[in-house]
UniProtKB/Swiss-Prot annotation:
Subcellular location: Plastid, Organellar chromatophore thylakoid membrane
Residue stretches spanning the membrane: 40-60, 124-140, 152-165, 207-227, 278-294
Free-text comment on the cofactor: The D1/D2 heterodimer binds P680, chlorophylls that are the primary electron donor of PSII, and subsequent electron acceptors. It shares a non-heme iron and each subunit binds pheophytin, quinone, additional chlorophylls, carotenoids and lipids. There is also a Cl(-1) ion associated with D1 and D2, which is required for oxygen evolution. The PSII complex binds additional chlorophylls, carotenoids and specific lipids.
GO MF annotations in UniProt: chlorophyll binding; electron transporter, transferring electrons within the cyclic electron transport pathway of photosynthesis activity; iron ion binding; oxidoreductase activity
Binding site for Fe cation: 214, 268
Additional remark text: 2 of the reaction center chlorophylls (ChlD1 and ChlD2) are entirely coordinated by water.
UniProt protein name: Photosystem II D2 protein
Length: 352
């Protein structure tokens, strides 16, 4: 006689049933992260499409910003709230709009709506990568890498305006609007001379260079395992053998530079590290701008340029350009301040 000793199956509650449904194998995986990702991404994208299509920026920036007013894809935008709104969350039912949807749009409520839902959507997408990596049984480096774009978005769209007087000084959601924000950062913060911006540029362009070099090197060293014009069809995702020669690639770059990667794992970690560090460092720099921190003020050159009409450097020329950006941008960018700059205070280079 056989006696089976076992544990009675635990009763399945609503959490287990929901967990099974969320993690069911389907074309688009949902998961627990999807409860955050899909609603927030849908609302952020919908708010942006609504704003760029219908909503004016006349009451916040004194400009047209929608397709309805004649803008195109490059010039339409969801503009930041009015300067007078400060750092209000601009809830539809809050004291500013008092439930009036049209008034809420006029005050810039859609920008706050898109920015906050967009931030949570990006966080949800990173959590999605964590969740699927855990289910598949791989390490979560994709999610860690995606923290770079999240850091940039949060620092630029949320932390920077929080350090300034209001949401008004954040970037509006549009192509030309982002360009205006870049000019603003240069004119008011001398952003291109900031070392964190330099590290960010080095990281992003360095990552692009590494990507191009890596792709070209792999294509160069593919094994000739087919008779067709290209070898793409000769590859099978489940094949055991290598599809390109790391030894040949190492030999090639050793001859080019005298040094080359000999370890695929170190090579690919480096390709991950360079662009992500670029994104992180540029985010740190933006946080510095939020606090109005200065970087690289070469005062001695400015003093000498002021005293000697024949002395000028690229730095002093850029400082004059920044003064021009501030003097010409501020009246157009902040019409509510009624700035008026007389001719004698506008910047003039030494050559003039």
């Amino acid at each position: 006689m056989t006696i089976a000793v076992g544990r009675a199956p635990a009763a399945r509650g609503w959490f287990d049933i929901l967990d099974d449904w969320l993690k069911r194998d389907r074309f688009v995986f949902v998961g627990w992260s999807g409860l955050l990702l899909f609603p927030t991404a849908y609302l952020a994208l919908g708010g942006w499409l609504t704003g760029t299509t219908f909503v004016t920026s006349w009451y916040t920036h004194g400009i047209a910003s929608s397709y309805l007013e004649g803008c195109n894809f490059l010039t339409a935008a969801v503009s930041t709230p009015a300067d007078a709104m400060g750092h209000s969350l601009l809830l539809l039912w809050g004291p500013e709009a008092q439930g009036d949807f049209v008034r809420w749009c006029q005050l810039g409520g859609l920008w706050a709506f898109v920015a906050l839902h967009g931030a949570f959507a990006l966080i949800g997408f990173m959590l999605r990568q964590f969740e699927i990596a855990r289910l598949v049984g791989i390490r979560p480096y994709n999610a860690i890498a995606f923290s770079g774009p999240i850091a940039v978005f949060v620092s630029v769209f949320l932390i920077y305006p929080l350090g300034q007087s209001s949401w008004f000084f954040a970037p509006s959601f549009g192509v030309a609007a982002i360009f205006r924000f870049l000019l603003f950062l240069q004119g008011f913060h001398n952003w291109t001379l900031n070392p964190f911006h330099m590290m960010g540029v080095a990281g992003i362009l360095g990552g692009a260079l590494l990507c191009a070099i890596h792709g070209a090197t792999v294509e160069n060293t593919l094994f000739e395992d087919g008779e067709q014009a290209n070898t793409f069809k000769a590859f099978e995702p489940t094949q055991e053998e290598e599809t390109y020669s790391m030894v040949t690639a190492n030999r090639f770059w050793s001859q080019i530079f005298g040094i080359a990667f000999s370890n695929k794992r170190w090579l690919h970690f480096f390709m991950l590290f360079v662009p992500v560090m670029g994104l992180w460092t540029s985010s740190i720099g933006i946080i510095g701008l939020a606090l109005n921190l200065r970087a690289y003020d070469f005062v001695s050159q400015e003093i000498r340029a002021a005293e000697d009409p024949e002395f000028e450097t690229f730095y002093t020329k850029n400082i004059l350009l920044n003064e021009g950006l501030r003097a010409w941008m501020a009246p157009a960018d902040q019409p509510h301040e009624n700035f008026v700059f007389p001719e004698e205070v506008l910047p003039r280079g030494n050559a003039l």
